A protein has these predicted regions:
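Bacterial N-terminal signal peptides that target proteins for export
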Residues: 2-12
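A sequence-level detector for low-complexity, Ser/Thr- and acidic-rich stretches
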Residues: 198, 209-211, 219, 320, ...
Length: 373
């Protein structure tokens, strides 16, 4: 079977899949929202990219012909191997299984999920190239323009009146850093997200969920490229800090304008290391390889392809988001009780949470019990 690949990594790393908190031993009171509105990339796209490709090229991708769940960059009961436990992306599982709300379907078919695989946090559109074309095209390249998150928000305003009782999700940044992980671009990406928070709030949004990104270099795609993996991990860590700072400033600015919002910050970066330290606690036996097309149980794998999580991974993100919304997630300043080995980068001096590691070679460290997170 010929596969389609996007040269600019459709998913910000799906790696996200990883985030999760330990099993719950207490009663949680779910928050009440009227609906969920989603802006993002392939981690949250449940049909917009497929809609575009069907319209322009008569290709149902992602879909069953390419061993993906229908319209989603993950697995399902009809993929090889099939999932027996979970269905849908993280926000679909959050809405359906945790919040008891209707699922936000893709916006091009009339729903409130405006996410597009390949989207960045910028305005306008991004041109993504599809290669290894299937029959009957027989080679060459296909391009598709996807709505970036700034345009997604504007399209939402054009379509609907903002609902103050809704939960708004803004999850991007992965594709931005995949495209360019320079320090200046990391700063620009964090600024973009904070500006979108202010834009939504000024229009009437009052509950906004903003995840950061996991260490992007841990996805299977970079297993054999340690230098790029280390650079992406470093950029992800920097983004985590800069996003927090920019969100603090955004909330302060809005408060000065008389606008009060509830801002939920999902620390996917920190959540990954909790999962990596004890994957078996979350039902995983493999958190480094892709399950797609392999004779394995995908419900025990974190990754479906070389970038995106399985529905089991998506489930852990949904569970972590619900803990956050319910006020039962670990406090951000709580120490991470973990032990994890990772590459942190190259260069004469590498900064790791306030420590400078000297030397010009690649640094490998074992992180134990870091705090605060």
């Amino acid at each position: 079977m010929i596969k389609i690949r996007f040269t600019h990594r459709l998913l910000p790393v799906l790696l996200l899949a990883l985030c999760a908190f330990a099993p719950r031993g207490f009663t949680q009171t779910p928050p009440t929202f009227s609906q969920v509105v989603v802006f993002g990339d392939s981690l949250s796209d449940d049909g917009n990219i497929r809609h575009l490709l069907e319209d322009q090229y008569f290709i149902s991708y992602p879909g069953g012909d390419y061993n993906y769940s229908d319209g989603r960059f993950t697995n399902s009961s009809d993929t090889d191997p099939s999932s027996d436990l979970y269905a849908g992306t993280w926000h679909e599982q959050l809405e359906r299984d945790f919040l008891g709300l209707p699922v936000a379907t893709n916006s091009l078919d009339g729903g409130t999920d405006y996410a597009f695989g390949g989207a960045t946090t910028a305005d306008g559109t991004s041109s993504r190239t599809v290669i290894s074309n299937p029959t009957p095209f027989g080679g060459g390249q296909l391009s598709v323009d996807v709505d970036n998150m700034g345009k997604q928000v504007q399209d939402y305003f054009d379509d609907r009146t903002p609902d103050p009782a809704a939960l708004y999700i803004l999850w991007g940044g992965g594709n931005d850093l995949f495209d360019d992980h320079s320090a200046s671009h990391v700063t620009e990406t964090a600024t973009n997200v904070a500006e979108l928070v202010k834009t939504l709030a000024r229009a009437g949004a009052r509950s906004i969920l903003v995840p950061n990104v996991p260490p992007l270099g841990v996805v299977p795609h970079y297993k054999d490229d340690p230098e790029t993996a280390a650079a992406l991990n470093a950029a992800s860590a920097t983004y985590r800090g800069e996003l927090n700072t920019d969100l603090d400033a955004a909330v302060a600015t809005l408060s000065g304008e008389g606008i009060t919002i509830t801002l939920y910050r999902l620390d996917v970066y920190g959540l990954f290391y909790r999962l990596a330290a004890n994957p078996e606690d979350y039902g995983f036996t493999n958190i480094s390889d892709s399950a797609q097309g392999q004779p394995v149980d995908p419900d025990q794998y974190l990754f479906w392809d070389d970038l995106h999580p399985t529905t089991a991974g998506h489930h852990q993100i949904a569970a972590a988001a619900f803990d956050l919304l319910s006020g039962t997630a670990p406090a951000p300043a709580q120490a991470l009780n973990i032990s994890s080995r990772l590459d942190v980068g190259t260069g004469e001096d590498v900064l790791i949470d306030g420590l400078i590691i000297t030397g010009s070679g690649a640094k490998k460290v074992i992180v134990r019990g870091l705090g605060p997170s």
